[in-house]
Swiss-Prot record:
Family according to the record: Belongs to the acyl carrier protein (ACP) family.
Record-given protein name: Acyl carrier protein
GO biological process: one example: lipid A biosynthetic process
Molecular-function GO term, any one: acyl carrier activity
Description of post-translational modifications: 4'-phosphopantetheine is transferred from CoA to a specific serine of apo-ACP by AcpS. This modification is essential for activity because fatty acids are bound in thioester linkage to the sulfhydryl of the prosthetic group.
Length: 79
């Protein structure tokens, strides 16, 4: 796992209070990890702060899984 993936996983565990073993790449924040819409907004804000990236609302709406978040952040950091 990349540093970005590890950091995303850590943020998800801290913000949602879920067991780390449940935070898999295909895990949906809402369906699998029990997040609600406010949780997802807070996660996006935490990702923005942790990685010094800006995630516009239209992009944030497409981030539904752990892998979506990792892929988006990796793409932004590479740009």
């Amino acid at each position: 796992m990349s540093d970005i993936a590890d950091k995303v996983k850590k943020i998800v565990v801290e913000h949602l209070g879920v067991d780390e073993s449940k935070v898999t790449p295909d895990a949906s924040f809402i369906d699998d990890l029990g997040a609600d819409s406010l949780d997802t907004v807070e996660l996006v804000m935490a990702f923005e702060e942790a990685f010094s990236v800006e995630i516009p609302e239209d992009a944030a709406e497409k981030i539904a899984t752990v892998k979506d978040a990792i892929d988006y952040i990796e793409k932004q950091k590479a740009a």
